[in-house]
Amino acid sequence: MNIIFLIILFPLIGFLFLSLIQGTISERNTNIIGISSIFVSLIITFFYITGFINYSSQIFTQKLFSWISINELDIDCSLILDGLSLSMLAMILGIGLLIHIFSTWYMKDKEGYSRFFAYTNLFIASMSLLVLADNFLFMYLGWEIVSICSYLLIGFYYKTTNNTSCALKAFVFTRISDVFLIISMFLIYNKYGTFNFQEIKFLSNFLNVEDCFDLNVLTLCLLLGVMGKSAQLPLHTWLSDAMVGPTPVSALIHAATMVTAGVYLIARTHFLFLLTPKILYLISLIGIITIFISSFSALVQQDIKRILAYSTMSQIGYMFLALGVKAWTAAIVHLIVHAIFKALLFLSSGSLILSCNNEKNIFNLSKVSSKCPLLYVSFLVGGASLVSFPLITSGFYSKGNILFSVLKDGYFNLFLIGLFCSFLTSIYTFRMIFVIFHRSSVSFVFSNKRLAHNLPLLILLFFSTMFGYFIIRLPLFYVFPMVKSLENGKFLYEIISSFISFLGIFIAYHIWIKQPFWFFRFLKFKIIKLIHKFLLNGWYFDFFYKILFIHPYLFISKILSYEPFDFFPTFFVAFIKKTNSIVLKSVNGNVKCYISTMFVGINLFFILVLCSFLS
């Protein structure tokens, strides 16, 4: 029985129901529609997972209908379910379901309750379409709807001007990137004569690596096309501003799912990048630079959600680094592990913010560990997984596989930078935890948490530990090329990595808990203040973009806003009016002026006549 299409259909039906009847049903009925639609899709996904337990090489396909048929161009609306799309689906629907359950507590009695669940259901449907589509064109449909959902949810509180500006910024940045994605699709069709992933993969086997200049251009455009959505340098600045939306949105879209769509697309088209090693190296360079920049920016942020946003950029950078060294499986495993612990951190921060009267500054948040131990443990486990705390966290194994793959592939310089940034990650993560939970501050009253609040956190907390990593077994064996695993030296690497994590936590404890006065005294130096301000403003990327792009664009737009053909009649009318005013000044009733004018006129007349005779 082929029912893949139902995975997309149920969330889509949920979106349509909630959109059409919003405001007319209770919050309880909204919950039932919004959650059950995703739950049914997740059950169907588990049905297919059972088919992959013993047959991981199996591929399910389903043709829905013929979309375009013009001469030799035949494009079907078809779905494909292999190990990669199944892994992504389990993550999207599993985490999406938990976030929807949490949102019933978070959004309770808030304006736009049904609208929120309608948007998130549409997002789940479009993200499912993105990973299930078997061709570029059908995938692009889901890709664009995901961007629309992101825009709608960032600007969910649209009555605030700043929120709409941030939503528009995210939309524009991702649109810039999408232009290159469209170009790459045209180049792919020109090269292969098809948009189908499996057909392109088959035809790529007959191409020569040495004779692929057009493939370099193609994969470069494809890389540029995914950088915007995955918030990689230089199209990364929108993500930190996207945190103005509801916190469950940040967990669902801007940490767990949408921002990883670029990683998925590169993994899906890995057979193209294998033919272009230079572009692969460029992917790893972009990843490591993004890791470096975002890690330093996170060190000085005071907004809890912006800290998590910069950490998201950094972790996606690690995924790009893995893709660049052909560690495809390591990238996807870290993608899913990161989605779990980052969703845990975002939901915990959302609970904390809501309980503390929407306070987001970590230095103003209260000492809450004794009042809500679940939040403290959630932050501790999620943060430990983020910093790759040894042995007991899932992040230790997933990120460790990436860095070890970089090392064994011979990129020692990239490995050192990645290891150093892992050290920075442990500092800024535990800076956040120590400041929030271990410093005395103003106390806030916490509301009693319901099952809808606690259950998602407990499930995510469990899967963020080592048990989650060992339970999750992704069916990727037949999706990517088989690579011989070399474990020589891995134990030594794990010791070094563990030491770095402990060192970062130790430094964070001494700077912000044990002896904070030394740190604040250090900040009084002028050069340190300038560096702090530079990093706090995200390396001034937005400032440079305004100077280089926005201001020239506004200047040119202002010039072009005037219709050029309107200039001539306006100028002619102004000339007539000016001439008329000058002539009128001569009619002033002064006889001497009239005689002088006549005298000058007669003399000019005779001079002209004389000149005509002489010529």
UniProtKB/Swiss-Prot annotation:
Gene3D superfamilies (UniProt xref): 1.20.5.2700
Localization in the cell: Cell membrane
UniProt record, GO biological process: ATP synthesis coupled electron transport; electron transport coupled proton transport
Catalytic reaction(s) noted: a quinone + NADH + 5 H(+)(in) = a quinol + NAD(+) + 4 H(+)(out)
InterPro entries per UniProt: NADHpl_OxRdtase_5_subgr, ND/Mrp_TM, NU5C-like, Proton_antipo_N
Enzyme class: translocase
EC number: 7.1.1.-
Name of the protein in question: NADH-quinone oxidoreductase subunit L
Species of the source: Buchnera aphidicola subsp. Schizaphis graminum (strain Sg)
